[in-house]
């Protein structure tokens, strides 16, 4: 939402500032840009301004048309934002989608031929041209010669059928076109294939939708290990067996029992960090306390594994449960470690909860803590005494000569984590040389862990993670810095089995900022040994019976 808060629509000045922040600078825009098109304005003044900017003439004529037609802010804002982005060239930094049939019908009800024409023109601009650019960028598509547009067209044909006919239709289609099934099962949802799509197709959204159809059609057998809405899954079992818990930290599920105002922030480490890096998780908690936040913590998963398995309804219910816990505790801020977690939650609650990437919070609050400590700044805004700034900001950074930052697939369009991590490195670790990969930011590669692909075709995961490692080696950097803890896990796992010359020192950004390392050798040893130890029979009965 360009107007990130309802109050931002109360006067033109705030409206203009909000639009500029979201559309032009993108410095503090929400996670999912598709939401920014969903309701770019929340009242008629904002809508008037956007329509005027979009078409490059005085806002009043078009604004009067929109405001007099009863079109919802959802459809109107979506259309205006789409046209605005096309006009100004901001589309490439924005996640967009076409208006749905229902939204087009709503616009048609406004009885405005011009508005109907513009909405269909905007949709046409996002129609796949089958240029095969995505095919050439992805081995999963290249081998069978598919493109994302063909996959979407097949999906649309299935979805046009009555719901009770879809499972049989999907089974028949995949039986006759196994190459398509194989490609869809090997998709990591990374979005690399459509990062430069000329018509703004978004592969992850469409590819993931097929998983739900596969589940409904009996073509996909989920693993109980990753059913994170159950009491027992791989992460909760690991924590229970090895005694990993946080009794000293108030859990989100219990936060509502405390006095109102006790908590304003929920820390969401994500399933990997909270399970495999308890000391680092606690260190982040100490920083949150020192930084003045009243926080509790959730040890839940964001539900991404459920989405990969095709359980969309279960994933939505799981996230809704977490959202209800947040609202019950009166919390207004969620701090996420992983870009993927932030993205999963944003569509549900970005209008109500401020979802902030942890590195962005560290950078912003660190500056405030510097000011409070009286740290002097240079003319460029950087601290004169870096050591004093580091102490004031509550960090304890590692000493490494050079790094290369591996941007997350989930940060591809948003870029908030990547900008903030690089910002922290430059501000508090200026002695560290940042050597950028050729494939970075929007063009970042995939580690191969997404979409639960490793369980179906581990070769894809291995090829992709080694591509990242090779790219990192080519920069000459000493250390590869990851954003997603799952990326950290995947690269660490590959390091354990790779030839010595291909091993690279790799750490999550939090390990660098707080000077603590995750002992992955111990983690992987425990993950293997727990199946043959005293808990082995229980694990096998729980997950494979």
What residue ranges belong to the model's regions?
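Intrinsic low-complexity, disordered N-terminal segments enriched in polar/charged/small residues
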Residues: 2-4, 9-10
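Repetitive helical segments and hydrophobic/amphipathic motifs
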Residues: 13-15, 19-21, 26-29, 35
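Membrane-penetrating hydrophobic segments
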Residues: 41-46
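Catalytic cores of enzyme domains
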Residues: 358-415, 428-431, 443-449
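Cofactor-cradling patches in redox/metallo enzymes
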Residues: 200, 272-363, 412-424, 435-545
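Iron-sulfur-cluster electron-transfer modules
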Residues: 72-97, 101, 108, 115-125, ...
